[in-house]
Design a protein with these regions (language model features):
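Acidic, glycine-enriched active-site microenvironments
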Residues: 1-183
Length: 183
């Protein structure tokens, strides 16, 4: 698996309210970006680093309850940031009279259960989540997006069936070509 899966698994075993770290929701207060749709996790990553350094790292990482509580707190804050920014983007579309019929939430982050739950609470937007099996590999996500675009258009039929797309072997380390040994 990847980091997102490990984070979610740990967070599901933890309780954010038990975490001693007070992690900030990025770009929320007193920032020139607080009213934009920008995403930034740099401040959150720095806060995580400092919070972990407040503990003896050997003790911290051997205490699974502490790690799980910390993971739950981090996930909660990261998801809140994503939801805040998504809400701002939806508000901007409405304010600018931009037509938006649906919002597709895709990529690896779309596999996060908490993010799916929290985004589903947003009103006035039709959310589309690809099947979880397609939320791990960007290449497959691109294929799925193309399939959906063709499926919903009045022009040519899909190039691939959903079964053909979902039967693709997914590997996070697939090579792009032959390495020639030169940089």
């Amino acid at each position: 698996g990847h980091g997102g899966v490990a984070l979610q698994n740990a967070a599901m075993k933890g309780d954010a309210s038990r975490c001693s770290a007070n992690l900030p929701v990025p770009l929320r207060r007193n920032s020139k970006h607080s009213k934009t749709c920008d995403f930034s996790f740099s401040g959150l990553k720095t806060a995580v680093l400092y919070a972990i350094r407040q503990h003896d790292e050997d003790v911290f990482f051997k205490n699974s309850a502490m790690v799980c509580d910390f993971a739950a707190s981090f996930q909660d804050v990261a998801v809140q940031h994503l939801v805040d920014r998504t809400r701002k983007a939806i508000e901007l579309c409405k304010r600018e009279n931009l037509e938006m019929s649906s919002l597709v939430v895709s990529g690896g982050v779309a596999a996060n259960t908490l993010l799916r739950e929290r985004l589903s609470e947003l009103e006035d937007v039709n959310l589309v989540f690809p099947p979880l099996s397609l939320c791990t590999d960007n290449g497959v996500m691109i294929a799925w997006a193309a399939h959906e675009a063709r499926r919903t258009s009045s022009s040519p039929p899909p190039l691939f069936t959903e079964d053909e797309i979902t039967s693709l072997e997914i590997s996070p380390r697939s090579p792009f070509g032959i390495y020639d040994g030169e940089d």
